[in-house]
Amino acid sequence: MGKVRGLRARVHQAAVRPKGEAAPGPAPPAPEATPPPASAAGKDWAFINTNIFARTKIDPSALVQKLELDVRSVTSVRRGEAGSSARSVPSIRRGAEAKTVLPKKEKMKLRREQWLQKIEAIKLAEQKHREERRRRATVVVGDLHPLRDALPELLGLEAGSRRQARSRESNKPRPSELSRMSAAQRQQLLEEERTRFQELLASPAYRASPLVAIGQTLARQMQLEDGGQL
């Protein structure tokens, strides 16, 4: 590219000068002034400007340093751990993705099943909504559908009653837990055992074979206690 000239330089011509007169230009550089003779203060300044480490002796072996793991700062260690964890996470994800890859037919089959389930759920919801609108439109005397929907299920009530009965039975002291019984309960237990023993002595099975009768009675009593605990 050429030199960019201003509008004045392009339109006006240069001034005519007489012979021997030089055209105006940049002024010649002024001759450097010679520094004055150095005094005592100048000598001190020159001494200060010289290399201050000229007489310093440094062992080259001290300049060689090794970056070891123990000498590294905590920040650098944390950065290294963060980088390694960040690099390991994508690899784990890639491994999980590689494990869950399914063939195209299986994907289409799963997608079709999901769509069928959604369609079935939508159909059931629409049918229920339609029945509710029909029930509201036609007033039926003795319609028990709202009451049936509001009441809890019978199975849930039965399960709750069974849990309450079991908790009550567990709260009652067993015959083996005499320390939890009161004096009246212990007296009642003794009366029951005495009555049961008298019935056993009066039974014909005891007269025929006492050991067999006692074993059968004890087994029956243990079964009753186990059933009460359950």
Swiss-Prot record:
Localization, per the record, is: Nucleus, Nucleolus
Q: What GO cellular component entries does it have? A: 90S preribosome; nucleolus; preribosome, small subunit precursor
Q: Which InterPro entries match?
A: Slx9-like (IPR028160)
Q: Which residues carry this modification: Phosphoserine?
A: 203
The highest taxon in the source lineage is: Eukaryota
Region of interest (Disordered), ranges: 1-42, 155-187
GO biological process terms on file = maturation of SSU-rRNA from tricistronic rRNA transcript (SSU-rRNA, 5.8S rRNA, LSU-rRNA)
Compositionally biased region (Basic and acidic residues): 166-177
Alphabetical list of Pfam families matching this protein: SLX9
Expression by tissue: Not detected in any tested tissue.
User: Is rRNA-binding found in the keyword set?
Assistant: no
Regions of compositional bias (Basic residues) in chain numbering:
1-11
Residue ranges with Pro residues bias: 25-38
Keyword annotations of the record:
Nucleus, Phosphoprotein
The signal peptide, as residue positions, is none
Entry keyword Nucleus: yes
Q: Spell out which residues are annotated as carrying Phosphothreonine.
A: 34
UniProt xrefs under PANTHER family: PROTEIN FAM207A, RIBOSOME BIOGENESIS PROTEIN SLX9 HOMOLOG
Say what the protein does.
May be involved in ribosome biogenesis.
Write out the similarity annotation: Belongs to the SLX9 family.
By what name is this protein known? Answer: Ribosome biogenesis protein SLX9 homolog
> What gene, per UniProt, encodes this protein?
SLX9
